[in-house]
Every structure is written in C-alpha cells, then in structure tokens.
Amino acid sequence: MNTIIKRFVQQLKISLSTDFWKTLISTLGAVSAVVTLISFVFQVHNPCTLMIVIYFIIVIGGSLIISWLLSRRRDSLKLKLSNTLTVNVNAGDIFDYASDTNYVVIPVNEYFDTVVNTKIVSPSSLHGQFINKYYGYNHIELHEQIENYLTENNVEYIEVTERPNVGGYKKKYPLGTCVPVQVGQVTYVLVALTHFDDEDHAYVELSEFGRCISSVCRFIEKNAGNRPAYMPLMGMGLSRLNQTGQFILKYTLDTIIGVKDLAIPGGLSIIVNPPTAKTLDLNSIKY
C-alpha cells in the first residue's frame, strides 16, 4: 500500500508541469459545463449550501483527477512512424531483451577491443558487460569472430603503431561499423560508437553519433528481416556526449526519422536504463 501511495505522489509531482496546468484549465471548463448542464436538466433551482459545496467538490476534484490522468508521466512510448517502421521506447535492461531470434545492439569502441579492465573496456559499460556475460576470459574467441567478419567484408581500417594501454588492439575502424555476433539464437550487433583519445579515453562528437545511429539502423534493415531489434539509449555513458537523456533520446529519434525510407518490419525498440528513464519526459515527445 505504501509503495502505491509513494508512486502516486511521485507521479503527481512530475505531473505538476505546464502541461498539467493547461490541461487543468481546459478540464475545469468542461467539467463545470457538464455539471451545469446536469443541474439544468434536473431543474435544480436555488440550490442549498450543501448542493453548492458538492458542486464545487465535483468540479474541482473531478478536474484534478482527470487532468492528472491525462498529463501524468508516461513510462513507455510507441511511435508508428510509417507502415514499415514502429519505434518503441521502454525502460529496462537491454540484456533482458536478448531472447528468441532478436537483434540486440551493443555500442563498442572503434578498435572493437575485447579485453575488459578499467583501462581499455570498462566492466560497467555495455561493451564490458556483454564480453563478461558471454565470453569471460575467452575474449580471444570473440576477437577472432570480429576480425574474421571485418576481414571477409573488406572493412577499411587504420593501424596505429601503439596505444597507451597494453592489450588494446591496434586496428581502428570507422565509427558506425557494425559487426554481428551470434550468441545462441540472438544476434548481437556491435557498433563502433566511440573514438579513443591519446590517453585511451572514449569520446564521440554529436554529428558522428548521429551517423552511427543511421548506420546501425541501415544494418538492421538489411539483416534483421521481420525479427525485432533492440538498441540501448546510446551516448549516455562513457561516450562523453555530456547531454541530458531527454536531449539524446530526442536526437536519436530525429535521426531515425531522418533515415530515408527506413523499413524495419519487426520494429525497433530503444531501451533506456531505469535511472535515466526516471528523468525523461515522454509526454513531450510527439511526431
């Protein structure tokens, strides 16, 4: 019971926004008109004090409840952008969607590193979590899969002479490069999202970030068929975009919409980690 009350209070706090007050003003007028019409139909003349009090309670109370229901914070979003593209936004753990024959996007760095430590691939990043979850200490196997795919598809790269941290690979691939990795029936799509600077710190420019999103969308369109695809809200972690979750989500959606004639019949879902999801205002996102 306490949890329900706390959730209601939290939702109410979030609802007390400009949208809430706009909705309340219009709802007050509508509810007041309905109550007035009812009193006219039933010929309520010279109402007593009790009737007046009841009238105000119904108008004010009803308006508050209706306004809250209409403007309360949404925790998911479904956007049908075309006959061949529906984008969903949901809160959760991206790995929970790794089932059946789904496509799941994992952002990685431009070297497609597979060594997880505090210097090369952070264990807290999705890149690191993916490696630890499915490959553990057998990261060489993953590296060979990635290398074979990139070689077979003649993906161009730049070979650097050295990197600050020993153990990092030295072939640098263009941002937006996608590599499919099969784990059981699930296809993980590793997408090069970030550069490494001279000290092996990850970063990405906003314009490059947009191109990466476009690239992974095209890859899914080409390969996923009717299978659903899931991607995290990228750019929130170690990529250092230094933008709010709201900005990045809107930018991501705008970029997806801007991909000409994009067709993903199985649907594309953007999965937002719960702490970030709490900061989002999905009510304001409209297309």
Model-based region annotation:
Residues N2-Y287:
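Macrodomain-like recognition of ADP-ribose-binding/processing modules
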